[in-house]
Structure formats: C-alpha cells, structure tokens
Curated annotation (Swiss-Prot):
GO terms for biological process: chemotaxis; defense response to Gram-negative bacterium; defense response to Gram-positive bacterium; innate immune response; positive regulation of chemotaxis. Keywords: Amidation, Antibiotic, Antimicrobial, Chemotaxis, Immunity, Innate immunity, Membrane, Pharmaceutical, Secreted, Target cell membrane, Target membrane. Changing residue 4 to A: Increase in antibacterial activity. Expressed by the venom gland. Potent antimicrobial peptide that acts by disrupting bacterial membrane. Is active against both Gram-positive and Gram-negative bacteria (B.subtilis (MIC=15 ug/ml or 4-16 uM), S.epidermidis (MIC=8-16 uM), S.aureus (MIC=15 ug/ml or 4 uM), E.coli (MIC=8-64 uM) and P.aeruginosa (MIC=64-128 uM)). Also shows cytotoxicity towards HEK293 cells (32 uM). Adopts an amphipathic alpha helical conformation, that may allow to partition into the target membrane. Also acts in inflammation since it is chemotactic for polymorphonucleated leukocytes (PMNL). The modification Leucine amide is found at residue 12. The lineage of its organism: Eukaryota, Metazoa, Ecdysozoa, Arthropoda, Hexapoda. It comes from the Eukaryota. Changing residue 6 to A: Important increase in antibacterial activity and important decrease in helical content. Disulfide bonds: none annotated. GO terms for cellular component: extracellular region; membrane; other organism cell membrane. It is found in: Secreted; Target cell membrane. This is Polybia-CP. It comes from Polybia paulista.
Amino acid sequence: ILGTILGLLKSL
C-alpha cells in the first residue's frame, strides 16, 4: 500500500 512506500521514504 501507499503507506509502505511512505515508510521507505522516511527511512531515507
């Protein structure tokens, strides 16, 4: 889901 993508971006 989009939340997963946002989580990865926050990891950066």
